[in-house]
Amino acid sequence: MSSPDIMIVFWGNPLYDGRCVNMINQFRDEKLTVKIIGVGKDNETFDFNGAEIKLINRAMLNSSLTKYFKYFKLIKRILKQESPKTIIASDLYSLIPCAQFKQQQKVKLIYDSREIYTQLAGLVNRPIIQKIWSWYEKKYIYSADYVIANAEIDQEYLKNLYPKISIKIFKNLPGSGFLNAKKIDIRDMLCIDRKTKIILYQGKLHNGRGIRFILTCLKHLGDVALVVVGDGPMKKSYINTARKEDVSDKLFFVDSVPYTDLASFSKSADIGVTIIQPISKSYENALPNKLFEYAVSGLPVICSNLVAMKEMVSIYKCGISIPPTDLNAFIEAFNTINKNENNFKIGINLQKELLWENQNKQLIQLIK
């Protein structure tokens, strides 16, 4: 069995992750052999665009006390079997076993710090757990030949923490599928009236994503529906908020869909939203992939006026940024876009510029 050129290790299902999917497609276009280790509902191995994806059953990792140690052990065992030439650790949890493996075998290691993992929203009010993950990152980040970040603000933050790391920026941009996707009739699928405007949120349903705030705004917007595409622990809370605000008839859910299908939903809405609340440093620095996915799909955007997001919509003139808890600002932004939506839709040349394939070509140079 020959060693793969690249192995991507990811604490999640890579088929539902745009960054993993886009990396796979980019590497396969270069005729590189690619294998991916992820976490899913079952133990299974299958092909995706010529790459082999191996999923670990998440039921094996359901103990809060032991799941990460089991994950570390499984990853190191697989890496030893596969002996890849280059490893991309797609999160902090994957960096640890990959760095430990590198101590035993010569291999190129790239740490994809797509978020500030030691400052995640889930670590707010959990200082001991936060210190543990910070210790792990500090211990192993220098094992990486390169660290890659999603935005300049993250690059600066990490460079201040770890001055000697070699860090590059590769933004969370959509693949070309978002440019050429077939449009799903979401109104027909969800029985939404043709005259109803659709606000779209796609992504994980976690605290601090601004969904409850948007639900509060909905009752002031007239004939408007919010379609949420994704899964997560906050779903029940959103349903309760909708009931409390008397907008249950305006809230629609679609379960998570594979990344390759996501563009079809983006094409079918009227406005895309990502009102991230600054409840952690990771959220303060956020430059979410959905922001670019909306823009490339032709959707005007309403987003938080956090540094990276505000800069993005200002540069590309694809939407309006607002204070993330300002109800009147959201309503005004919605009305402004609704009256002049073409002013906030970027042209085809700019859409092409914002594709992963066109902006992240240098990633191949890190691999070779």
Residue spans for each PLM region:
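Membrane-proximal helix-turn-helix segments that form the acceptor-binding/catalytic region
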Residues: 25, 72-80, 96, 100-104, ...
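Conserved acidic donor-binding segment of nucleotide-sugar-dependent glycosyltransferases
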Residues: 315-316, 320-327, 334-341
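Donor nucleotide-sugar binding/catalytic pocket of nucleotide-sugar-dependent glycosyltransferases
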Residues: 38, 130, 134-181, 192, ...
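Nucleotide-activated donor-binding/catalytic signature segment of Leloir-type glycosyltransferases, i.e.
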Residues: 229, 236-264
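Short hydrophobic beta-strand element within catalytic cores of glycosyltransferases
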Residues: 271-274, 293-303
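A charged, aromatic-enriched C-terminal amphipathic alpha-helix characteristic of glycosyltransferases
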Residues: 339-367
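Conserved donor-binding/catalytic core segment of Leloir-type glycosyltransferases
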Residues: 7-9, 148, 193-218, 227
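Nucleotide-sugar donor phosphate/pyrophosphate-binding loop at the beta->alpha transition
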Residues: 66-70, 108, 117-140, 156, ...
